[in-house]
Amino acid sequence: MLRNYLDLPEILSQVYLNQYTILLVLVVVKLILLKESLIDAISKQIINDATCNDDNLQHILNGVHDAILKNIDKLQYSGIVFVVLILKTIRELTSFFIDLLLGTYVCLLTAVVVGTTEFAFDASESIIQAVNVTVVAAADEIEDGLRGLSNFINDLVTGFNAIRTFFTGSASTSDADLYRDRINLSLGNLKDKISIPSTVLMDIQNARNFSMNELENLNNETQSLVNSPFNLVINKLDAIKLEINRYDNSSLQPIQIRDACLQTVNRVQDSQTVLIKVVENVSKWFLIVLAIIIACSLAYAFYIELRRWKRLSEFINEGDVADSEVGYRNEHNIYDNALLYTMIKRFGISVNERVIWVISYMSSKMAGIVFAFGIIGIISAVLQLLMIYFVQQAVDDEISTMNNSNENFEMASSYIRSMNNYINTTQSSINDELFGDIIDTSTKVNNTIAEFVDNLDSAVHSIFGESIIASAVNTVVYCTIGRKLEKIEAGCNWLAENVKIDIPEVPSEILRELQNISFLQPQNLMENFKPILDLYRNSVHLELLISLIFLAVWALQLIIGLMILLARQGINASGAGGAGGAGGTGDAEGCDNYTDNKVILMRRVTPLQIGSPHSLTEKERQLYQFPISKPRFDRSSDTLSSFYPPTSTPGRIEYPLHI
């Protein structure tokens, strides 16, 4: 008889066509397509040299550069003119203030002093003249009286001498002359000493001619001292104003945008090369892993087919095969299912028939295809997501590297720093030249004011001395002049501390605007790869979702299987109840056996069919009185049965068929 089935070698010759290998090959194709697509997307020029040929931006940057320098020069000139005006105003106001205060109060003091001294001098002269007239007249009268008294006394003395001579009889003219000289009374020099000398009146006349020349000279000297430092600063500022462009700005050059653009192009192209290498390396390793998995799947398929052939052979040679179709199909199901065979036959695990049915339902050929599609789809999606992940990491690394060492950003930042340094240096130089002498000026003005106050005190003291009006004059001078001068001194100090030119630095907005220029920031260009990767990632997510749906459909078979079991159990229960009511148990038993395959109602209307022939079991041979010591299959000719003649195939024993 010609064999029309495939034996084991013929089956193994098609093992490479198993569904797992085919699906894995599709995964390889999918990865190759993804690799080529990523390389094509990465290789596209997101920037090229043509972008750097646009000179418009260079002209704009040059214009901004020149505008900044010109504005600095204009600001310097304006600042100098403004400061000169301020200094001239302060100088004139200070001179005017000093002249106003000091000149006014010199005039007032002169009037007060002159009026007071004139009154005092006139009174003194009148008193002196009156004293001289009165004292001299009195002295003359006293002199006349003394002379008369002296004559009287002398006459009296002469009489006394005559009487004494009369009585004594002796006469001496010398004694009479002696007494006359002693009794001669007169004011003599005392009369001249009583009158006030005429030199006093001469001194009074000279004192009338005093003046306030000291205060007037002090006013003029103070104005000259105060004006001198202001004049010095103003002259220096005028000289600087004429040389406003003498600061060296040759080291400041505008950003060369073309060079920066070419650097960006080269940097982006280098990053693209790195990303392409990452895609190639990752895909290469994934393809190697898939090749190993495919080889393993071939080995697994080879092993599965080999085991399946052996299981079928064991099933054919199985002696204890049930004598019913249900039992036969049950045994065939166990041998045909690798999982059930391993659990029951190899490990001897006792499994309920319903559990066996559920496992068979979920591991059927149709369900297995769905399961295989789901698993292989998940593997494919995971590999693609891993490839996209590695590319994403490479892009992030490149962007991070560019952020850490961005030459164009450093170029822009360096330009801004250089410009700000130039502005600060220029500002410092201008302030030193403009206001460097302001401190000296304020110091000189303060010293001048202090010297002026000292000289004023000396002048007032020299004029009024310890007179009764000296204290009042000092108080008036301090309240009217001294306090004002203290305010001037405080104003000079404030001027030295606060007057300066502030040149504004280049605003940070310009640096941010430079950062926003795309071809100056390669990391911004690299950000364009992220939307592409997101697009691929979304498509792979869709594939993963479809694969999960396949697995969900396969898992749904468990629910469907359990529902079928419950339906069969309900039908069996109703069929068993109907058969028992009819008075027989044979049908009920037949129904129980047959409900493992079909519905009872279908069995009643389905005609009986002759089953497939198979070898007799030991019980059947005993039933048919066959010797049980003979083998079931023996190709030798001496094992022929005496009951049945040999068939056309020599060496083959044909046993009765069990229908």
Curated annotation (Swiss-Prot):
Transmembrane region(s): 22-42, 96-116, 286-306, 368-388, 544-564
Membrane topology note: Multi-pass membrane protein
GO cellular component: mating projection tip; plasma membrane
Extracellular side: 1-21, 117-285, 389-543
Classification via InterPro entries: PRM1
Keywords for the protein's UniProt record, in alphabetical order: Cell membrane, Conjugation, Glycoprotein, Membrane, Transmembrane, Transmembrane helix
Major site of localization recorded for this protein: membrane
Residue positions the entry lists as glycosylated: 132, 184, 209, 220, 249, 281, 403, 424, 446, 516
Topological domains annotated Cytoplasmic: 43-95, 307-367, 565-659
GO BP terms, alphabetized: plasma membrane fusion involved in cytogamy
Annotated compartments: Cell membrane
Family: Belongs to the PRM1 family.
Function: Involved in cell fusion during mating by stabilizing the plasma membrane fusion event.
Protein name, UniProt field: Plasma membrane fusion protein PRM1
Organism: Lodderomyces elongisporus (strain ATCC 11503 / CBS 2605 / JCM 1781 / NBRC 1676 / NRRL YB-4239)
Name of the encoding gene: PRM1
